[in-house]
């Protein structure tokens, strides 16, 4: 360690703050917080016999140290979190911002509230229920609610503009407040019952429903009594599946972890109103810091990304700086008292042990899956002669409609799994007509330039196409100056002498093109390596087609609006401001349009838009997805680059 760094260590303050460890290139490799900065940072250099890789290499890795002083531990937690999100250091716990927590939102301030599926909690006065462990679990809950409690499911826009009841009203699952004057008192009674059901307050809810059922039977309202009976049966079946975990009926998040070497898996067990509500695992690698630091950092990041903050947070061990700062921060986020506890006995300790058992089981399962994936990736590296182990792969596809709406997609796979935080969409900027080779050159150039700026390059690029597309991608790599990334092309065979295209069962084998190799490589079509590549290629194709249709629709509606006589810039802005998007303008009825531009102009706009039919026919190519629950990501495009030799 150089003398300048030793001086910094000697001069470290004893106050609370955040420290940033940097490598010799100035890159932040770790961010931590401490009540006493000097004690915490110097402890990394005073631990004799410490076998952790990070500590043993700290003298070689550390190039600089930066500290930021704050007033208290709560401020240190906030600043630590912001700096981790900003720098994404390699040795910190990093949570993906992928909206993975599904919950239900109910805004009781509305005249006719509805349940909404959301992925983030806001302090907006609404009630939130969850999180749910899977989309299937939340669908089952909504199925029961929609069938037996009869709340509306339509959006506020539809509620305000619908002129006649929908099918749900006709089958008795919605009172249709969009059309009929439904008494708010009756509707809000159903809302109260939904809240009791979602909170797990079975006794109070069931007792009230039984009284209503008896009253309906006494008044000879047998259909209503039968409906309430079915409602009771469904509620009781649903509650039977939920295990009672505690007798104090609180909302709790229970944290635990399992660690082997530098790999760690955190597990969060959700308890709502004393009942187990599921849980989720969070695996991480290259984690060399003490357990106490990692659990504190993980909990802080977990709640920062919008997770519901319960009444109690249970931890598996004491934190180095205590729980006071974390408790104050969570209390501020929730707006009411939150207790952070490390249980020593009783039901709470049993919950921590249960979470730890789930963490160990999830760790073992993921280790087995990772070992299998690593074997497949190793074989792929060997068969294709790749320089890099293909831990992170990105696949690119070009899509257009008859030469217009030219777009490209980028999908990413990390350790064999879809990495949707790295999905990107591109609009081709430098071409006015179709040229797949030049389009591929542009997209690869833009991707690699951005990757060089952010020090974020994949191990392998997979190009959807044959020799031509591969040559364009390789030319872009050379022009940008990237030589460390492998690149291959993936295309179907067109050898008609070998494969009968008319035979129903015939399937052309996939061929893999490699730079500098004359003949393509043909892997076994049923191999795991081939399946991984084709699944990624099909996902890139699906993603590109979806984006291309969005672009095409927007351009057509925009063009149609511009061609309608009397619709100038002001009216176009009025329509977009009212409906929110070009798609909604195109979907609007004449009556809905008339509310914005008047009856006469509404008929003209409706006729003009529907005179430009959209290409909604199903694509003949079967589109496969890496994840059925995929949601489109926001468009992220980087700076353009002129096409080169393609």
Swiss-Prot record:
UniProt domain UVR: residue ranges: 203-238
Pfam families hit by this protein: GIY-YIG, HHH_2, UVR, UvrC_RNaseH, UvrC_RNaseH_dom
Annotated GIY-YIG domain residues: 14-93
Any one of the GO BP annotations: SOS response
A GO CC term assigned to this protein in UniProt: excinuclease repair complex
Subunit-structure text: Interacts with UvrB in an incision complex.
Record-stated family: Belongs to the UvrC family.
Function comment: The UvrABC repair system catalyzes the recognition and processing of DNA lesions. UvrC both incises the 5' and 3' sides of the lesion. The N-terminal half is responsible for the 3' incision and the C-terminal half is responsible for the 5' incision.
Protein's recorded name: UvrABC system protein C
Organism this protein belongs to: Myxococcus xanthus (strain DK1622)
Lineage: Bacteria, Pseudomonadati, Myxococcota, Myxococcia, Myxococcales
Encoding gene (name): uvrC
């Amino acid at each position: 360690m150089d003398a300048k760094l030793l001086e910094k260590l000697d001069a470290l303050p004893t106050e609370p703050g955040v420290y940033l460890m940097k490598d010799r290139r100035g890159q932040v490799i770790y961010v931590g917080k401490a009540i006493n900065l000097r004690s915490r940072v110097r402890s990394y250099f005073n631990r004799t016999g410490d076998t952790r890789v990070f500590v043993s290499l700290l003298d070689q890795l550390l190039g600089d140290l930066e500290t930021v002083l704050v007033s208290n531990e709560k401020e240190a937690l906030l600043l630590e979190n912001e700096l981790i999100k900003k720098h994404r250091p390699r040795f910190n716990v990093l949570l993906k911002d992928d909206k993975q927590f599904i919950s239900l939102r109910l805004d009781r301030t509305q005249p006719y509230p509805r349940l909404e599926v959301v992925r983030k909690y806001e302090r907006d006065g609404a009630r939130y229920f969850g999180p749910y462990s899977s989309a299937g679990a939340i669908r089952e809950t909504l199925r029961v609610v929609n069938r037996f409690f009869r709340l509306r499911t339509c959006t506020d826009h539809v509620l305000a503009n619908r002129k006649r009841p929908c099918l749900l009203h006709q089958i008795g699952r919605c009172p249709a407040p969009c059309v009929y004057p439904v008494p708010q008192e009756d509707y809000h009674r159903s809302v109260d019952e939904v809240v009791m059901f979602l909170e797990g307050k079975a006794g109070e809810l069931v007792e009230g429903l039984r009284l209503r059922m008896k009253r309906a039977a006494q008044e000879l309202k047998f259909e209503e009594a039968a409906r309430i009976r079915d409602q009771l049966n469904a509620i009781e079946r649903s509650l039977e599946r939920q295990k009672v975990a505690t007798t104090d009926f609180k909302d709790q998040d229970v944290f635990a972890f399992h660690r082997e070497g530098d790999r760690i898996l955190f597990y969060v067990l959700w308890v709502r109103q004393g009942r187990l509500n599921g849980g989720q695992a969070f695996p991480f690698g290259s984690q060399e810091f003490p357990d106490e630091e990692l659990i504190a950092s993980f909990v802080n990041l977990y709640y920062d990304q919008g997770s519901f903050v319960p009444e109690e947070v249970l931890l598996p061990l004491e934190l180095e700086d205590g729980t006071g700062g974390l408790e104050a921060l969570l209390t501020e986020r929730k707006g009411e008292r939150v207790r952070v506890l490390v249980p020593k006995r009783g039901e709470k300790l049993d919950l921590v042990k249960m979470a730890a058992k789930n963490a160990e089981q999830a760790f073992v399962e993921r280790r087995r899956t990772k070992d299998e994936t690593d074997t497949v990736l190793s074989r792929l590296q060997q068969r294709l002669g790749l320089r890099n182990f293909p831990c992170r792969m990105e696949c690119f596809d070009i899509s257009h409609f008859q030469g217009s709406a030219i777009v490209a997609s980028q999908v990413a796979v990390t350790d064999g799994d879809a990495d949707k935080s790295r999905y990107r969409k591109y609009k081709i900027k430098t071409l006015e007509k179709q040229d797949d080779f030049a389009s591929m050159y542009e997209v690869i150039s833009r991707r690699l330039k951005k990757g060089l700026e952010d020090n974020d390059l994949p191990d392998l690029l997979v190009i959807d196409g044959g020799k031509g597309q591969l040559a364009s991608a390789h030319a872009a790599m050379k022009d940008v100056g990237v030589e460390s990334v492998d690149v291959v092309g993936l295309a179907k065979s067109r050898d008609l002498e070998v494969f009968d295209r008319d035979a129903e069962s015939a399937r052309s084998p996939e061929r893999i093109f490699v730079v500098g190799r004359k003949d393509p490589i043909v892997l076994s079509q049923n191999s795991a390596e081939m399946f991984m590549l084709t699944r990624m290629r099909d996902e890139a194709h699906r993603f590109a087609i979806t984006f291309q249709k969005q672009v095409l629709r927007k351009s057509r509606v925009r063009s149609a609006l511009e061609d309608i006589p009397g619709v100038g810039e002001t009216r176009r802005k009025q329509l977009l401001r009212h409906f929110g998007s070009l798609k909604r303008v195109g979907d609007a009825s004449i009556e809905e349009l008339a509310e914005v531009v008047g009856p006469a102009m509404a008929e003209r706009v409706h006729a003009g838009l529907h005179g430009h039919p959209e290409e909604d026919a199903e694509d003949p190519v079967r589109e496969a997805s890496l994840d059925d629950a995929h949601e489109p990501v926001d468009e992220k495009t980087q700076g353009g680059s002129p096409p080169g030799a393609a």
